[in-house]
């Protein structure tokens, strides 16, 4: 079909339905069911069998080269993983504009919707067995019922235990492959009804099958999730991630505990509006997890609305929700806890049902020594736990990590794996009709689709668990997709950097990259409906050997992965700076009279710090423009873009909650503006509106709270943060007496802040240049009809457009595109380095404030921070968050060679001084003064030896910079005299 007609049809359609059927290979594309930052999800079906599938179309235009590489290596991981509790990648295709992932379709939505709807999801109803107690329940017109859950609180206990066991199976399998999920949450746990085959093989009748989704997208998630503070993900994050500390696989166990708590109680264990508040609540709990039924019992309330949580589940939750990873239950203990024993297979006995309360089956687990120890230890530790006041969130302070309660004793001698399938029933086979509901979380982990690159051989460090056995079902269909029930607990630790690295080294997790191999003559590829030409056909699955050990086919031979042992590091300086700013603000509220060693105010000029916009007031309409920023690590759109509403899913009453923000608007971002001439209004050059400023995710989250509090007090955190967010430079006005030490500190910090700001401003200009070049390259290289967010499924249209593009191309245009790409990368390189140098000055300033504050609080009990010091702290906090976020995004666009562009700073200083001179001649004295000041501070930054890698500035450069500063200082002094005379004031 013509591409113009296809594009016009997409523009006219609402996105939920299509007037024509489009195809990808052997698949027919149906209605859109989800949309993400750079992916659109469609429901479709196989053209011959009409088996429903989900097609995720990922736009290559929105992917940077690094994100594209991550996506491709993620595909290589997905195509060799076969497990009934992990969503399957059925097929994949790619063209010049899109990558298409054909995945299972799960019709039962996700666990979060299941909990909210109390299991009443249309596709999850079932016909009760004759003679069972459920047959007495009222049915619908088709004679079906939904699984009965309590009207309030958590899910039915049997469903909770079954879901937990299925989740544990998936985690154990991933762990055996040296993979971490790192984003376990209800939105990533998809549900679908069990097939007749699965029920016949022992799956509990009426309970949905749980599948883990998006597990491979999490290597870069922690940094992104900090930007998703308001989207819910941090509610299930381990505290070590919230503290910006390095973490290992035990972070998944915290998330499992949080999910188990929500299944048992009906809400997350800790709730907060941002990750700082969430961390405070976790620390304040002091490992004392209190359940609703315990609160009612302690308060002697007669209201018995809370459903009692079984004691063994309580003990498991408390063992998992330990703040310190070393105190948290380990994987072996978790897999052997026995909480889900007896609930992974259908019971042959008559069910006992209560519609009001769930049955407490923990009594049947009395023979488990481990559970008895967990319950006893937890009950003893509860009596000793005394809630304490949460400390200020200073990450460097030991008070942030208080000692937890006595850890639960664990019997590690028990070797039997309770996770394995009971030997009385065969292992269920993969059904031939996969279903999958794909959410809009975007892939971010991976290498080339065709062909994957080879890698070095793995080195096992421990033997697999001999307790895991599996046998193939005699009723398996022809060529079924193999199922791995519970992966062995083999600790194969594979590192792309070599096994000999130091334990303390921190490396980027290396994804599994299977080499390209053809079909093995000795082992036929199980049929999954995969085209012979598909990249998936080259990747044999992981299977279980006759001895119960995992066997990797040739696709995984020689692969390497450091996921099992590597740590992930998130910028800890962020939380330290935000915590210090919070503490300064809290200290500034104490009603005490400060000591003063002198009564004079500082005579330093602060004109360069005066904001163009007036102070923010309660009715300032620009506050509403401060917007939420998408996660920079997951998106090709910069972190300062605006969010637009997400389209509703069509044909689905229970769409999945988005795990990433919706699609974003295009460039240019409002925070970056081209530098106009100095003859224009000063605000155009040196000031921007408060609403256009973007700070980091934390600052924006706090600012949203601050907006509601502005006007209540001149010294509230809300006022300070909102003002700091609206200022491009600190506005230090001496309004109170202060001692000499604080005066000297503020003078030093102001100097560092000025240097940080001018470098930040120059980095913004380079980032703007990079985005404009990217738009130019995208416009010149994208054929007509292939733009937009909706992928062109018509192969004929794509081929015609590509042919037309080739006819128009020439050698000169190719050279032009290469030049644009080189300039684009160079601009990104400059922006990254300049942002990092600006961050260095900010961190240096905050360190000085931190040392001063610590010395003062050690000497004077209850020392009060001045309003000036608090204002400076809030400005540093806001600027750090914004700079850090932009640097992270710019880094995804930059190359490998990053050098400090001192020549660029020098040229900018000279050009700025020239424009200031022109403004002075034209009579715009205020603009001229700001230009001279900016030029001087650019040169001052070049004279600071800390910006150079070797820590010293060449002598000839130092002489040149100092010589250049002399005439600029002279002009600035003369200009200030003119300003003083014109305003009737004495010279400053």
UniProtKB/Swiss-Prot annotation:
It holds the Pfam family ATG1-like_MIT1. It is an enzyme of class 2 (transferase). Residues 1-21, 394-561 are annotated as: Disordered. Residues 468-478 have a biased composition (Polar residues). GO terms for biological process: autophagosome assembly; autophagy of mitochondrion; piecemeal microautophagy of the nucleus; protein transport; regulation of autophagy; response to starvation; reticulophagy. Gene3D superfamilies: Phosphorylase Kinase, domain 1, Transferase(Phosphotransferase) domain 1. ATP binds at residues 33-41, 56. The active site is at 183 (proton acceptor). The keyword Kinase applies. This is Serine/threonine-protein kinase ATG1. It comes from Cryptococcus neoformans var. neoformans serotype D (strain B-3501A).
């Amino acid at each position: 079909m013509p591409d113009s007609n296809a594009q016009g049809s997409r523009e006219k359609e609402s996105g939920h339905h299509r007037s024509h059927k489009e195809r990808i290979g052997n698949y027919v594309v149906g209605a859109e069911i989800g949309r993400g930052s750079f992916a659109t999800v469609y429901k479709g079906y196989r053209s011959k069998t009409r088996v429903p599938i989900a097609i995720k179309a990922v736009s290559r235009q929105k992917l940077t080269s690094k994100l594209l590489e991550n996506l491709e290596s993620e595909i290589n991981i997905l195509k060799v993983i076969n497990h009934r509790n992990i969503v399957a990648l059925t097929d994949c295709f790619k063209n010049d504009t899109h990558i298409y992932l054909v995945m299972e379709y799960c019709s039962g939505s996700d666990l979060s919707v299941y909990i909210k709807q109390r299991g009443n999801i249309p596709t999850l109803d079932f016909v009760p067995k004759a003679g069972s107690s459920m047959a007495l329940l009222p049915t619908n017109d088709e004679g079906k019922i939904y699984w009965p859950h309590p009207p309030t609180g958590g899910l039915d206990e049997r469903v909770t235990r079954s879901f937990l066991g299925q989740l544990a199976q998936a985690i154990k399998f991933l762990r055996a492959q040296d993979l971490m999920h790192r984003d376990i949450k209800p939105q990533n746990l998809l549900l679908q009804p069990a097939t007749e085959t699965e029920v016949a093989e022992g799956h509990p009748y009426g309970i949905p099958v749980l599948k883990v989704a998006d597990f491979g997208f999490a290597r870069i998630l922690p940094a992104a999730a900090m930007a998703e503070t308001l989207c819910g993900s941090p509610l299930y994050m381990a505290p070590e991630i919230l503290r910006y500390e390095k973490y290992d696989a035990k972070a998944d166990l915290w998330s499992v505990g949080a999910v188990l708590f929500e299944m048992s109680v009906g809400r997350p264990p800790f709730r907060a509006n941002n990750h700082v508040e969430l961390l405070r609540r976790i620390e304040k709990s002091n490992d004392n997890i209190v359940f609703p039924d315990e609160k009612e019992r302690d308060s002697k309330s007669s209201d018995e609305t809370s459903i009692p949580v079984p004691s063994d589940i309580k003990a498991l939750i408390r063992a998992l929700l330990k703040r310190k990873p070393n105190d948290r239950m380990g994987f072996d203990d978790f897999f052997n806890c026995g909480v889900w024993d007896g609930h992974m297979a259908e019971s042959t006995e008559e069910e006992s049902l209560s519609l009001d309360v769930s049955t407490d089956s923990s009594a049947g687990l009395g023979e488990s020594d481990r559970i008895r120890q967990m319950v006893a230890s937890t009950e003893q530790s509860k009596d000793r736990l005394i809630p304490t006041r949460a400390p200020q969130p200073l990450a460097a302070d030991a008070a942030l990590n208080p000692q937890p309660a006595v850890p639960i004793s664990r019997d590690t001698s028990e070797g039997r794996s309770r996770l394995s399938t009971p030997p009385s029933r065969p292992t269920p086979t993969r059904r031939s009709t996969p279903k999958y509901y794909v959410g809009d979380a975007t892939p971010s982990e991976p290498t080339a689709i065709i062909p994957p690159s080879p890698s070095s051989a793995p080195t096992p460090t421990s033997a697999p668990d001999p307790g895991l056995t599996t046998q193939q079902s005699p009723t398996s269909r022809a060529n079924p997709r193999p199922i791995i029930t519970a992966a062995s607990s083999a600790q194969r630790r594979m590192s792309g950097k070599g096994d000999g690295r130091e334990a303390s080294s921190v490396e980027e997790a290396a994804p599994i990259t299977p080499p390209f191999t053809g079909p093995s003559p000795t082992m036929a590829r199980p049929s999954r409906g995969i085209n012979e030409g598909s990249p998936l056909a080259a990747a044999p699955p992981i299977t279980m050997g006759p001895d119960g050990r995992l066997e990797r086919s040739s696709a995984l031979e020689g692969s390497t992965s450091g996921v099992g042992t590597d740590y992930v590091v998130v910028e800890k300086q962020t939380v330290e700076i935000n915590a210090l700013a919070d503490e300064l603000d809290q200290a500034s509220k104490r009603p005490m009279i400060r000591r003063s060693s002198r009564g004079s105010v500082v005579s330093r000029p602060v004109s360069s710090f005066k904001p163009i916009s007036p102070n923010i007031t309660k009715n300032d309409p620009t506050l509403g423009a401060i917007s939420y920023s998408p996660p920079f690590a997951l998106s090709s759109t910069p972190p300062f873009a605006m969010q637009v509403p997400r389209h509703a899913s069509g044909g689905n009453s229970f769409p999945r909650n988005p795990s990433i923000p919706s699609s974003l608007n295009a460039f240019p971002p409002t925070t970056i503006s081209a530098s106009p001439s100095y003859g224009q209004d000063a605000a155009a050059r040196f000031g921007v509106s408060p609403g256009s400023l973007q700070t980091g995710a934390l600052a924006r989250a706090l600012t949203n709270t601050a907006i509601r509090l502005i006007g209540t007090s001149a010294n509230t955190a809300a006022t300070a943060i909102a003002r700091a967010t609206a200022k491009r430079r600190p506005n230090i006005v001496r309004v109170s007496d202060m001692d000499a030490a604080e005066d000297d500190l503020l003078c030093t910090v102001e100097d560092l802040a000025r240097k940080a700001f001018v470098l930040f401003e120059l980095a913004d200009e380079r980032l703007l240049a990079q985005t404009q070049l990217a738009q130019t390259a995208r416009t010149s290289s994208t054929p007509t009809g292939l733009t937009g967010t909706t992928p062109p499924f018509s192969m004929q249209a794509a081929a015609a457009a590509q042919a037309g593009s080739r006819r128009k191309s020439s050698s000169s245009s190719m050279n032009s595109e290469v030049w644009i790409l080189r300039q684009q990368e160079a601009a990104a390189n400059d922006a990254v380095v300049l942002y990092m140098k600006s961050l260095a000055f900010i961190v240096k300033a905050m360190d000085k404030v931190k040392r001063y504050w610590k010395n003062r609080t050690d000497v004077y009990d209850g020392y009060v921070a001045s309003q000036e010091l608090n204002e400076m702290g809030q400005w540093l906090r806001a600027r750090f968050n914004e700079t850090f976020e932009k640097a992270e995004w710019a880094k995804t666009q930059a190359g490998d060679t990053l050098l400090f562009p001192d020549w660029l700073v020098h040229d900018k200083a000279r050009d700025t001084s020239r424009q200031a001179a022109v403004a002075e001649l034209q009579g715009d004295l205020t603009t001229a003064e700001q230009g001279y000041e900016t030029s001087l501070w650019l040169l001052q930054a070049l004279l600071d030896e800390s910006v150079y890698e070797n820590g010293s500035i060449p002598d000839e450069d130092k002489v040149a910079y100092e010589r250049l500063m002399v005439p600029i200082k002279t002009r600035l002094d003369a200009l200030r005299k003119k300003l003083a005379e014109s305003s009737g004031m004495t010279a400053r």
